[in-house]
Amino acid sequence: MAIASMIRRAGIAAGLAFAATTTVLAQTAPSLLDTIQSRGALQICTTGDYKPFTLAMDGSFEGIDIELAKSLAKALGVEAKFVQTKWADLLTDMGSGKCDVAMGGISVTLDRQKKVFFSSPYLVNGKAPIVRCADKAKFQTVADIDKPETRVIVNPGGTNERFVRANFKQAKIEVYPDNVTIFDQILAGKADIMVAESIEVKVQEKAKPGLCAVNPDEPLQYGEMGYMLPRGDATFKAFVDQWLHLAKATGEFAKIYDQFVR
């Protein structure tokens, strides 16, 4: 009995020692947080084609997430360096270490979450159609849109394309490479409809007379946006989440948002 008790106690002690060692290793494991500060720069991947979040303008970028990226870099005490990417390359660029964070209206999805971390969501969004105003009454639901005569246009490689292919089985789908001029194709009568994030279609409705967002406050699909982070780096994610929390609590986030949306 005494021997059995000693074995049990030894097992418990070994387990506690292993847990303590694991905790220490987790606490001392190198983090991108340290690398960024040593480097003196935060490398931010962004597509530059998604107004009002990120838009490439004459060699620089502007938008909600561009200003927030600068805020994050300032909180880290480093310079913000932007790296242009494409929607189809986001996960590859994050996995290769090309960037420390990806920002620019990126939807949080379970498929993406399998490969990367995301910050806490910073915006609730969802997919909504945008059409010529004369056609607004025709395209109220997925069923209204999914007809053989409907021409749906979509940018490649992101959640817009995934939504379109998952939900429209009869409509004609055209993949158009330029997410900046894609809305002009609808105005020109070369396509009937595009489905994008509700905030984007609201902005485009204001920017392009003749286009109307369809029920943007009642989107076809619920969605959230977050900042894409390297998988496994809990220390860096904790810093980004706390920075985001403070940006919202202090009103900095709202001020930047209103600058581009209101």
Spell out what each predicted region is.
Residues I66, F82-T92, F139, E174-A188, ...:
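Short helix-initiation/N-cap motifs at beta->coil->alpha
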Residues D89, G105-K114, F163-A166, F183, ...:
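A ligand-binding cleft/hinge motif common to bilobed small-molecule-binding domains
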Residues V124-V131, S198, K202-H245, R262:
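Periplasmic-binding protein-like
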Residues C133-R151:
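Flexible hinge/capping segments at coil-to-helix
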Residues M1-A14:
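Bacterial N-terminal signal peptides that target proteins for export
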Residues T54-A56, A69-V78, T141-V142, D146, ...:
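Ligand-binding cleft/hinge of the Venus flytrap
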Residues Q27-G105, K114:
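Extracytoplasmic small-molecule ligand-binding "clamshell" domains
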Residues Q27-S31, T159-I173, A213-P216, L244-R262:
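Ligand-binding clefts/hinges and TM-proximal coupling segments of bilobed small-molecule sensing domains
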